[in-house]
UniProtKB/Swiss-Prot annotation:
Belongs to the acyl carrier protein (ACP) family. The modification O-(pantetheine 4'-phosphoryl)serine is found at residue 37. InterPro entries: ACP, ACP-like_sf, PKS_PP-bd, PP-bd_ACP, Ppantetheine_attach_site. Carrier of the growing fatty acid chain in fatty acid biosynthesis. One of its GO terms (cellular component) is membrane. This is Acyl carrier protein.
Length: 77
């Protein structure tokens, strides 16, 4: 999980301009990290590229926290 989390953290920091310390597993993209719906779409696209996978729109809607992303990605690798 550590490597996956660190890769996700880097993407979130770069995309949302938040401090790395704010990107915790329980952090909500919208409530804690200030992402709007466009930010979330762009994050999903970057995650797909980084981890070489496809996240369906239906699955993307279920992803609310950093931990959700880690769980989703690790479940598909």
């Amino acid at each position: 999980m550590a490597d996956t989390l660190s890769r996700i953290t880097k993407i979130v920091v770069d995309r949302l301009g938040v401090d790395e310390a704010e990107v915790k597993p329980e952090a909500s993209f919208k409530d804690d990290l200030g992402a709007d719906s466009l930010d979330v779409v762009e994050l999903v696209m970057e995650l797909e590229d980084e981890f070489d996978l496809e996240i369906s729109d239906e699955e993307a809607e279920k992803i609310a926290t950093v931990a959700d992303v880690v769980e989703y990605i690790e479940g598909r690798q």
